[in-house]
Swiss-Prot record:
The keyword Cytoplasm applies. It holds the Pfam family PIN_4. GO terms for biological process: nuclear-transcribed mRNA catabolic process, nonsense-mediated decay. It is found in: Cytoplasm. Involved in nonsense-mediated decay of mRNAs containing premature stop codons. Residues 1-21, 195-218, 356-393 are annotated as: Disordered. Keywords: Cytoplasm, Nonsense-mediated mRNA decay. This is Nonsense-mediated decay protein 4. It comes from Debaryomyces hansenii (strain ATCC 36239 / CBS 767 / BCRC 21394 / JCM 1990 / NBRC 0083 / IGC 2968) (Yeast). One of its GO terms (cellular component) is cytoplasm.
Length: 416
């Protein structure tokens, strides 16, 4: 995985040039055919999902993103009667990689997830280079077969970084005010370092000298960062934001690189889409990034909302009209049977294993260290299928001595 440096905003040569590079040795017909999704299974419907992931989506939702590649999880969430192919295109801008390089340092949970996200991305690219696309990256023992989701994960190239920032301002549809941000917070946590209130009885000079000597220490840096998260409402930064809530907010400088990439993919790349659901959308867990991206007309969603788009074809960005006739009574709370809120997960699609209950007398004299661990044998846990309940609900009966779990990643559990 390579990190591409940020290009200058004053790069007029790139600005006036074509954003696509073509290989002179490759015919134009082959390039056009390669850009089109291949019809792997003729006769099946196809649906394209295009998402842009920033670092917060990986750091705070790495478990969810891994499930997108787990075939057992996909089988349980996608309607088995829907005969369709899903082309999931995941775009990782260079902004995400640079933020990984900053977040991955340390021993915090965010740093651990950032390193895990980098390893996960590397694993996917390694399997593509080795020609192992047929297997499940989350379950190497799975057998190749007809898949419901076809993946295309790629990293931003230098010619895809987007136009200059002065040109990006032409796409701005709204100038957000400070009061539109959650908790009036318009800056990232790293920009708020050192802005906690000065303790009583301590001068400004001594306080600043204390910060300068301790910020060289990584542990002191993290401690002050955590202190700002806890006492942000008592900080001078919060008081200034509260007093100027009606003023226009100022965008964090480094966020421009993400906005430029999103503008290029959504407005400049000029790809034809069959529906608004297929347009490029930014997946982020950061509320500050979401406000600024929406101000440029870029649809945003979190990781859970992205799962609704992938598995249920439900876009959270679609506007829903308010019906004034509703009185919020019990009758109004009922939803249509095909509503997204009525969908359930068929857990019987997960693999079952038999519950072994060894007797105490049998293993009483055995040494625990010499006991061999055997892999549990998979069984059919469904006893009867096709039953209906009193309300006409579909019911499946399971064996009492069988158990199944949601799919998890393979590997050994780390122990301190």
């Amino acid at each position: 995985m390579s990190l591409y440096p940020y290009n200058s905003d004053e790069d007029e040569a790139r600005k006036n040039s074509n954003y696509h590079d073509f290989d002179e040795l490759v015919p134009s017909e082959e390039i056009e055919n390669a850009s089109k999704p291949s019809d792997t299974f003729p006769g099946r419907k196809s649906r394209n999902i295009n998402v842009i992931l920033d670092h917060s989506a990986f750091v705070r939702g790495i478990g969810n993103i891994k499930r997108w590649f787990n075939q057992e999880y996909i089988k349980a969430h996608i309607d088995p009667n829907a005969d369709e192919e899903i082309y999931l295109n995941i775009y990782i801008p260079s902004y995400t990689l640079h933020e990984f390089d900053y977040v991955k340092k340390g021993t915090s949970m965010m740093a651990t997830n950032a390193r895990e996200a980098i390893r996960f991305i590397d694993k996917i690219f390694e399997k593509e280079l080795n020609g192992e696309d047929e297997t499940d990256p989350m379950n190497p023992d799975s057998k190749p077969g007809k898949k419901s989701i076809i993946y295309d994960l790629y990293i931003e190239s230098p010619n895809e970084s987007g136009p200059s920032w002065s040109e990006c301002l032409n796409y701005k549809v709204h100038s957000p005010k400070i009061k539109e941000f959650p908790n009036f917070k318009t800056k990232f946590d790293s920009n708020l370092i050192g802005q906690h209130p000065i303790p009583q009885g301590e001068s400004l000079e001594s306080h600043n000298s204390f910060d300068e000597t301790n910020y060289n220490n990584s542990s002191a840096y993290k401690q002050n960062n955590k202190l700002n998260d806890i006492q942000y409402e008592n900080s001078q930064s919060y008081q200034n934001a509260l007093a100027n809530a009606d003023e226009l907010a100022e965008m964090p400088t480094r966020l421009r690189y993400l906005i430029r990439s999103c503008i290029y993919k959504r407005f400049i790349e000029r790809k034809s889409f069959n529906s608004p659901l297929e347009e490029w959308k930014l997946v982020t867990e950061d509320p500050i990034t979401k406000v600024w991206a929406k101000s440029f007309g870029i649809d945003c969603m979190n990781v859970n909302e992205a799962e609704l788009l992938i598995f249920q074809s439900y876009d959270i960005n679609q506007y829903q009209l308010y019906d004034p006739r509703h009185t919020f009574s019990v009758d109004d709370e009922s939803h249509a049977p095909n509503s997204i809120l009525q969908n359930t997960i068929d857990t019987t699609l997960y693999s079952y294993t038999k519950i072994d209950r060894p007797s105490k007398s049998k293993n009483k004299n055995k040494n625990k260290n010499t006991k061999k661990s055997t892999k549990p044998k998979q069984i059919n846990g469904v006893v009867s299928d096709g039953c209906t309940g009193a309300n006409g609900d579909f019911v499946k009966k399971e064996r009492f001595d069988a158990i199944n779990y949601a799919p998890r990643g393979t590997g050994d559990l780390w122990k301190p």
